Amino acid sequence: MRSQPHVLGIVLAGGEGKRLYPLTADRAKPAVPFGGAYRLIDFVLSNLVNAGYLRICVLTQYKSHSLDRHISQTWRLSGFAGEYITPVPAQQRLGPRWYTGSADAILQSLNLVYDEDPEYIVVFGADHVYRMDPEQMVQHHIESGAGVTVAGIRVPRSEAFAFGCIDSDESGRITQFLEKPAHPPGTPDDPNSTFASMGNYVFTTKVLVDAIRADSENSDSDHDMGGDIIPALVAAGEASVYDFKDNVVPGATDRDRGYWRDVGTLDAFYDAHMDLVSVHPIFNLYNRRWPIRGATENLAPAKFVKGGLAQESVVGAGSILSAATVRNSVLSSNVMIEDGATVEGSVLMPGVRIGKGAVVRRAILDKNVVVGDGEIIGVDLERDRERFAVSQGGVVAIGKGVWI
């Protein structure tokens, strides 16, 4: 039986998420609720835990209180055999300054690496929606002999200009790492597709530590993992690509295999929710063999009264629909929709209240938003723009606790 390598997980969760405003006005991006029962960070943590990686440091910074609390309450491990998932705010170990970039966050947290002394380090982002078995990527990294392995997802070449792109040879060695190039490269076996970086990396520990320390002495660096560390290791011939399509997750369907979404904008966040609601969803939340774990609340079941109806929708625990109609929507816990109200193509976070006869269409309502009787949202975008944020795609976004 092959012994498992000693692996430390580092999750980069300090993102500010300006493009998701107003959802990030009062919380870090990885703490934004998603899918009716989760926060964005639950996807990466579920992937790591399902793979058996139970020593994980989550590096936090921006408005991190709700994120730190969620990790501490939801992701408590037994502590048996040194298992832990711990939030690590900026410690200012190297002087009175906060993290200046993702690489600097790791630099300021190298004491955690030295304490754990792992053979390999997985460095994953905290704000993508997907399933992945990181163990398969680690094994690929070991077999490749590279210093760093970058997860790449195949995207149409015509759309790849929006991503950090990977140019690799037939052996998988990365020859160029290009940030949003005007002319993206093809993959070795398909000129019409491009490897886009998923922001997930596996490092041999010494390679990461040496690269982080060298970068810290470069005054011209932005101290960013994707912008500085990876290109430097590509130039040194130390980087390889891991093809995400080769990752086989137990219980995945043909429809959701290979699903990965960057939800960094309001439109992308909205679209990812719409991927959840069909009879055969593009992303299946109900895979019991590779579960996504979230906070467990002691709530009553959802209730539908006086002919309340929900079609092609996700409805969270504790929610009540009273003579209301919900279509193609995701409702989190404790949502109340009153008589005669209509909700279509919308995302409602915990504690939202929709008054009698109100209409909500193509909208994202943050926690504890109250929509008064007869109010109309998402129908007249010109009027909505005077009151709320409206995305390029016409999605109305209303921040936490707003009364309308």
From Swiss-Prot:
Q: Which GO terms describe its biological process?
A: glycogen biosynthetic process
This chain belongs to the protein called: Glucose-1-phosphate adenylyltransferase
Q: Which UniProt keywords apply?
A: ATP-binding, Carbohydrate metabolism, Glycogen biosynthesis, Glycogen metabolism, Nucleotide-binding, Nucleotidyltransferase, Transferase
Pathway noted in the entry: Glycan biosynthesis; glycogen biosynthesis
Which top-level enzyme class is recorded in the Swiss-Prot or TrEMBL entry?
transferase
GO MF annotation: an example = ATP binding
Which reaction(s) does its UniProt entry say it catalyses? Answer: alpha-D-glucose 1-phosphate + ATP + H(+) = ADP-alpha-D-glucose + diphosphate
Gene from which this protein is expressed:
glgC
This molecule's function is given as: Involved in the biosynthesis of ADP-glucose, a building block required for the elongation reactions to produce glycogen. Catalyzes the reaction between ATP and alpha-D-glucose 1-phosphate (G1P) to produce pyrophosphate and ADP-Glc.
**Which family does this protein fall into?**
Belongs to the bacterial/plant glucose-1-phosphate adenylyltransferase family.
**Signal peptide per UniProt:** none
**Annotated binding of alpha-D-glucose 1-phosphate, by residue:** 99, 164, 179-180, 197
Q: How does it assemble?
A: Homotetramer.
Work out whether the entry's keyword set contains Disulfide bond: no
Q: Which InterPro entries match?
A: ADP-Glc_PPase, ADP_Glu_pyroP_CS, GlgC_bac, GlmU/GlgC-like_hexapep, NTP_transferase_dom, Nucleotide-diphossugar_trans, Trimer_LpxA-like_sf
What EC number(s) would the UniProt record show? 2.7.7.27
